[in-house]
Each structure stands twice: as structure tokens, then as C-alpha cells.
Amino acid sequence: MEGFLSHQPWWRTGVPTEIIRSREGVGELLHRLEREKKNPFFVVDSVLRDQSVFSPLLGQKALYLFDASASEPKTGDVDTVVSIMKSGSKAYDVVVGIGGGGTMDLAKAVGICLANPGPAHAYQGYGLGMNKGADIWVLPTLSGTGAEITPIAVLRGPEKKLGINNPYTAPSVAVIDPGLTSGVR
């Protein structure tokens, strides 16, 4: 790092994400959603379905279980979730991603694509899809990816693996529960 920083006249970073640290992450997330009168749509890593700590979330009607074991989310996954969300009678105002980096990236991309017409692969790149979509909230279950604060959603598209990169892709809220990230789940 010293070599990199020695060539920079300044170094600044900004994180637009509100970070909430709680040992009761799931409860804190649900309480906050209720308190703010949000209509959430949950994107949850399917590996979490058998863990009792997530039972209150899995009872939600607006839920998409994502199999994150394969690889990064695909642009087709984003299009599927957007279609599900738009076909319902509810207007969802927040997409909640719960899981590892791939699941959070899927939720982030869905949040952007809800407000921008066309397929998700059209927004892979920098500064595309600049209409702000639904709020994006995340609850990571794996530490180290950084997806909970970054303005990038990495997707595997029909022709390339590339991120959706714009200021609205960063989650507005991240609930960090150290108990959920203490081991790979």
C-alpha cells in the first residue's frame, strides 16, 4: 500500500451506506423495516433456508431464494426478480439482500433495474441505469466481500462478467451481525 499511497496527493473515501451493528441482526432488520413502514422484497441465499435464525424472514410472502453456490448472479436472475416484483399487486420500496456477496449483488442490481427500462445486461458498465430505484438494504452472512457498502453489483451477463456501477447501487442500509459472519454459512 505504501507504494500506491506515495503516488497519491490525497486519499479520500466516502461510504453512503448507513451501517448498523447488532447482535440481533435479523430482528433489528425486521424492526427497522416495520418502523419505517417499508414494503420489502427479500432476496435470500437459499443455503440459509434451514437455519432457524432466519425463520422470521423466510415466512415473508415477498421472497426470492437465490442459489448462490453456482457463481455470481446472472443478468437473467436480475430480470427474473424484477419481473416477479413488478407482477405483484404491491409496490415494493426496498430490496433486502441477505447472504454473501453474490446475493447482495443480486439485490443491488434488482434495486437499480426496477427503475430503469430494459434488461439488466444493458446496465453493465459505468454510470448506466441512473434512475434511482428501490432502496437497497443488506444483511451479510459472509465477511470480506465488501458488497454491503460498494456501489458495484457484479453480474455474469450473456456476453461478459461486469458490474453495474453507479452511485445508486450502494446499499442505503447494511445491518452487520457479527454472529452471522463468524463462519461460512
Please place each PLM-identified region on the residue numbering.
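Short glycine-/acidic-enriched loop or helix-start segments at secondary-structure transitions
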Residues: 51-54, 106-108, 148-149
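Short, hinge-like loop/turn segments at secondary-structure boundaries
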Residues: 59, 83, 113, 153-156
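N-terminal loops that bind phosphate or other acidic moieties
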Residues: 63, 110, 170
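Acidic-aromatic/histidine active-site loop/patch
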Residues: 101
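A glycine/threonine-rich phosphate-anchoring loop and its flanking beta-alpha core
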Residues: 115-185
